[in-house]
Amino acid sequence: MRNINIAIINYECGNIHSARKAFELALTELDISGSVTVTNDPEIIFKADKLVLPGVGAFSECFNKLKSVKGLSESITERVHDHGVPILGICIGLQLLADKGFENIESKGLGWISGQVENLCPDDKNLKIPHMGWNEVNFKRDDGRFSDLNGEDFYFVHSYYFNAKNTIGTDFRILIWTSSIKLYTERVMEIA
């Protein structure tokens, strides 16, 4: 079995400790040889087999911090787009892949996935924002990757959602599969 090198991208907007611990536990539990490195060094990112982009905070602030580290967003883009390295965006980490976001101010995103991050405004005014609590997740289209998760409960804490352009309706997306995946969940270790 080959060694898997996972790089968790540190741009000062993520719950880095929890992400690192979750991936270290997943490697151990699944008996996979590998390493988990927290980094903002483009050279380490170029050597990684898998990338993780966590994120906590406001969209525009996180985007600006990501862009402020010299060569960071360019190295991530090259690894994902040119070399096909998979990336897992967690919370705002996935949202940053959108064209733009509207948290506090309108802000440009990386533009990797068509769509925008919008305020969660339910039709039912009795529903509270931020959306917090356990909810059942149902997949509209499942190619089998997530069949074990359909109907499972996940914990949500958010006020914004990724409105992908290739979908319609009022449901909000918690997972968009392209070269990335995102789950709003505190159960990352259990799922892994």
Predicted regions and their residues:
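Gly/Ala-rich beta-loop-alpha elbow adjacent to hydrolase catalytic centers
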Residues: 89, 93
